[in-house]
């Protein structure tokens, strides 16, 4: 009789454990896409169905670029970002900041003027370059103190994101903006080596894989409000040092 009771307890504990694990997995299964936006993830590649703008709404300049350069698949992108901070009053050491960044592809603003398989791949690499920018921002935030922790600029260890985000964002956006234009100029206008560019981007993504956009990053923008209950969107970010 005692053995049966022990066995029943063991079975009960087993099922409790399974339920807890299942619940945890479900909580971690973050949504990374909406009807209008795709947030970058390594296993979510762009397809023709994602380009949902009616070709009849496309400006004549885009039609001309399609005819002149073969640039007939055109995507619309954005680099979404937000910083959530501890809400309300808090004790020393309890303040937290959480940064979310996710490259976004906007379906309603993206169009295929004329079907082109290479054109679709070119757009995927543009999306990947935005992911490079996101990873670089995270990397630089992790290493920024080494550059600015001197006698003239004092670093506050409690709020690294709200202090330095805009400066690093502007720095990376300028660099990768130029990179995207160079890429399009060489691959689309000059009909250069697309594979070389793709391999360069893929290699750099792999180098910075530790700083990849996570499903949680994406879900913050799908939900459009803080994920954690004790957090609120930061009201103030220090201005960029690159802007006077």
Regions found by a protein language model. Give the residues of each.
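Extended, composition-driven regions rather than compact fold-specific motifs
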Residues: 26-114, 127, 131, 135-244
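Bacterial Sec-dependent N-terminal signal peptides
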Residues: 1-30
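Short, charge/polar-rich alpha-helical segments
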Residues: 118-128
């Amino acid at each position: 009789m005692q053995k049966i009771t022990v066995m029943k307890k063991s079975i009960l504990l087993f099922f409790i454990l399974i339920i807890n694990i299942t619940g945890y997995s479900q909580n971690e299964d973050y949504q990374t896409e909406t009807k209008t936006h795709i947030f970058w993830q390594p296993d979510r590649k762009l397809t023709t169905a994602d380009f949902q703008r009616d070709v009849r709404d496309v400006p004549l300049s885009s039609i001309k670029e399609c005819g002149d350069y073969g640039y007939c698949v055109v995507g619309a992108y954005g680099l979404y970002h937000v910083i959530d901070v501890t809400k309300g009053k808090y004790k020393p050491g309890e303040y937290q900041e959480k940064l979310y960044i996710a490259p976004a592809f906007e379906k309603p603003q993206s169009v295929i003027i004329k079907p082109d398989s290479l054109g679709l791949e070119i757009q995927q690499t543009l999306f990947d370059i935005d992911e490079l920018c996101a990873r670089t921002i995270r990397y630089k935030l992790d290493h920024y103190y080494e550059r600015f922790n001197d006698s003239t600029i004092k670093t506050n260890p409690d709020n690294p994101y709200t202090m330095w985000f805009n400066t690093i964002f502007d720095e990376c956006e300028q660099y990768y903006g130029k990179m995207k234009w160079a890429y399009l100029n060489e691959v689309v206008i000059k009909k250069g080596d697309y594979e070389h560019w793709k391999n360069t981007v893929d290699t750099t993504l792999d180098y910075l894989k530790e700083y990849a956009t996570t499903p949680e990053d994406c879900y913050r923008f799908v939900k459009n409000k803080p994920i954690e209950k004790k957090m609120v969107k930061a009201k103030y970010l220090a201005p960029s040092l690159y802007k006077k």
